[in-house]
Amino acid sequence: MARAAWGLLWLLLGSAGAQYEKYSFRGFPPEDLMPLATAYGHALEQYEGESWRESARYLEAALRLHRLLRDSEAFCHANCSGPATSQPRPAPGPDGDNEGDGEDWARELRLFGHVLERAACLRRCKRTLPAFQVPYPSRQLLRDFQNRLPYQYLHYAHFKANRLEKAVAAAYTFLQRNPKHELTAKYLNYYRGMLDIGDESLTDLEAQPYEAVFLQAVKLYNSGDFRSSTEHMERALADYMTVFARCLAGCEGAHEQVDFKDFYPAIADLFAESLQCKVDCEANLTPNVGGFFVDKFVATMYHYLQFAYYKLNDVHQAARSAASYMLFDPKDSVMQQNLVYYRFHRARWGLEEEDFQPREEAVLYHNQTSELRELLDFTHMYLQSDDEMELEETESLPEPEKPLSDAEFEGEGDYEEGLYADWWQEPDAKGDEDEAEPEPELA
């Protein structure tokens, strides 16, 4: 009944257009608002019934609703993540100070006081945003959207609706997160062959702002324009850190509770689920270039900066970039030699000891990611059990119900399958020459 009601509401709407057009998580049109599960479920029903245009319309609406929820969660948690405005004061011990059990009790009380304040802040924030006025989606549904599964259905729906340009964009968007998915790669090559589309025309509908800036910085680096390259790379680095912080904040949204547990195990379950999401942020935000994810993405940006600043004779920044890189790859012998070289000539360039310290944002990022992984490893080692907690493994993506038949490929010829960027080069003298590991092959 509820689904029918939402469906009637949606039928009153005009064409949705691209999923992110005129998007605002603060002022989302009330008439466009519906539960994510409702929009996506109806899209799949229409897909099964071969109502391709209607299916595509609801899939785009679902993608838009998912972004609304993701951005709204990140906004509220980022705005409520500051230090507590007031904290309970520890009760004094018999002699006026806090020792032993009293100190532990006081520390725990302060912690939960901060939790309560943050919960109140989140409640106030979410009360004002459209995304939280409808039922919250399940964890599995959110995982499907994180893996870009809707684009598997969307590209084929667009193809059957004779919207080849949109089919290309949807298929390419899915492959940017799932580059080893052979069937979707076959679809994309088929669509590109029909339209004669080159690599430069491919669009990732979920691309982050730093990705294009990073690629432009690499192109400028390879052309020898080191000044412009450093400007673009610094911007890409700053943009990435902003998106990474937003990703961490978005991992603290609503969580399903499926059984009854003691107080602390229940808290540990929720915290471990949030930890897994935060650890995944690093991989989920890594750009895909030519079908491969950029290995050690943040470290790679510092490596480019190190060499570009050196070529610009800005050795102060070059040394700090080298030290920042070493946080992520301390065994890189070439970078070790670079730092030795800078130290040997420190008098010549007027370098101080602070010039050999990593940059602040690099230290923060390294500490965050390292500590998150350590905590997650602890939960895997000591908290995971059938009775206490299950940290779910990533599931293989299911295939859409309507695959292309061999007949649809007959007579079209072979099309180029390589998506490699010809201009991509590693930085000069990079010590780590290992290729980026591809994602596990999906079903």
Swiss-Prot record:
<dbReference type="InterPro" id="IPR011990">
    <property type="entry name" value="TPR-like_helical_dom_sf"/>
</dbReference>
<dbReference type="GO" id="GO:1902494">
    <property type="term" value="C:catalytic complex"/>
</dbReference>
<dbReference type="GO" id="GO:0005783">
    <property type="term" value="C:endoplasmic reticulum"/>
</dbReference>
<feature type="signal peptide">
    <location>
        <begin position="1"/>
        <end position="18"/>
    </location>
</feature>
<dbReference type="GO" id="GO:0000795">
    <property type="term" value="C:synaptonemal complex"/>
</dbReference>
<keyword id="KW-0732">Signal</keyword>
<dbReference type="GO" id="GO:0046849">
    <property type="term" value="P:bone remodeling"/>
</dbReference>
<feature type="region of interest" description="Disordered">
    <location>
        <begin position="387"/>
        <end position="443"/>
    </location>
</feature>
<comment type="similarity">
    <text>Belongs to the leprecan family.</text>
</comment>
<dbReference type="InterPro" id="IPR052284">
    <property type="entry name" value="Collagen_mod_leprecan"/>
</dbReference>
<dbReference type="GO" id="GO:0017185">
    <property type="term" value="P:peptidyl-lysine hydroxylation"/>
</dbReference>
<feature type="glycosylation site" description="N-linked (GlcNAc...) asparagine">
    <location>
        <position position="367"/>
    </location>
</feature>
<keyword id="KW-0256">Endoplasmic reticulum</keyword>
<feature type="compositionally biased region" description="Acidic residues">
    <location>
        <begin position="431"/>
        <end position="443"/>
    </location>
</feature>
<feature type="compositionally biased region" description="Acidic residues">
    <location>
        <begin position="387"/>
        <end position="398"/>
    </location>
</feature>
<comment type="subunit">
    <text>Interacts with PLOD1, P3H3 and PPIB. Identified in a complex with PLOD1 and P3H3.</text>
</comment>
<keyword id="KW-0325">Glycoprotein</keyword>
<feature type="compositionally biased region" description="Acidic residues">
    <location>
        <begin position="407"/>
        <end position="419"/>
    </location>
</feature>
<dbReference type="GO" id="GO:0032964">
    <property type="term" value="P:collagen biosynthetic process"/>
</dbReference>
<dbReference type="InterPro" id="IPR056585">
    <property type="entry name" value="Leprecan_dom"/>
</dbReference>
<dbReference type="GO" id="GO:0030199">
    <property type="term" value="P:collagen fibril organization"/>
</dbReference>
<comment type="function">
    <text>Part of a complex composed of PLOD1, P3H3 and P3H4 that catalyzes hydroxylation of lysine residues in collagen alpha chains and is required for normal assembly and cross-linking of collagen fibrils. Required for normal bone density and normal skin stability via its role in hydroxylation of lysine residues in collagen alpha chains and in collagen fibril assembly.</text>
</comment>
<dbReference type="Pfam" id="PF23557">
    <property type="entry name" value="TPR_leprecan"/>
</dbReference>
<feature type="region of interest" description="Disordered">
    <location>
        <begin position="81"/>
        <end position="102"/>
    </location>
</feature>
<protein>
    <recommendedName>
        <fullName>Endoplasmic reticulum protein SC65</fullName>
    </recommendedName>
</protein>
